A protein has these predicted regions:
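Basic, polyanion-binding surface patches
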Residues: 2-201
Length: 201
């Protein structure tokens, strides 16, 4: 029988870099991956909690399921782990302040994180962010805890497309806007953005 030849498509320099990469190099390389920004919320009222997702992706279209990765050290994770239902709020391009509000570890309480933004109550009791790019209402099927994170498979029970014109993305450790906001579109076509006073007002 003939032998099987295995060819590596990486140049020698890439193979060497992969073999000797240190933690700093790995993290720097990971920061080159642009990704959407989502806030995961559970509960309502005084029981509501939220945390920034490390990543969100579509696991399956039929049946509809998301793969949601969250940091287990975040203050909101304990409430998230106790709840079987959660909402994934995909942030729009003009919601950078909300992203900063849900990032960090500084407080064990989550109440203050909901002080900005307009929050709505869904039929099943979940809090969701108005005017975001999209909202997925999910039910946890399985949670896999690995290292610092929890990998959650969530069945999508309902999805809503929001009114955001652009998307918020994370790249190289910073947030940026992809696409134009409604106000930028208004200015481009010579209209006054919403919220700006008209002449004579």
């Amino acid at each position: 029988m003939g032998s099987t030849n295995v060819h590596c498509l990486c140049p020698p320099s890439a193979q060497s870099a992969r073999a000797t990469a240190d933690d700093a190099t790995i993290l720097a390389a990971a920061r080159q991956v642009a990704s959407g920004v989502s806030v995961v919320t559970v509960g309502a009222g005084e029981e509501r909690a939220g945390l920034m997702a490390v990543s969100v992706s579509l696991l399956s279209a039929d049946p509809a399921a998301l793969l949601v990765c969250v940091n287990r050290a975040r203050p909101g994770y304990s409430a998230f782990a106790r709840s079987r239902r959660f909402a994934v709020n995909v942030l729009g391009g003009d919601q950078r302040e909300i992203a900063h509000h849900f990032t960090g570890f500084r407080d064990a309480s989550d109440a203050w994180r909901f002080d900005i933004g307009r929050w709505l109550l869904l039929a099943d009791g979940l809090s969701c962010l108005a005017d975001c790019a999209a909202v997925f209402e999910c039910e946890t099927e399985e949670t896999i805890e690995r290292h610092a994170n929890a990998i959650v498979i969530g069945w999508v029970r309902r999805a809503v497309i929001g009114g955001a014109s652009g998307a918020l993305v994370r790249w190289r450790g910073a947030y940026d806007q992809l696409g134009w906001s409604r106000d930028e579109i208004s200015r481009a076509v010579g209209l006054r953005p919403s919220g700006e006073a008209q002449d004579g007002c």
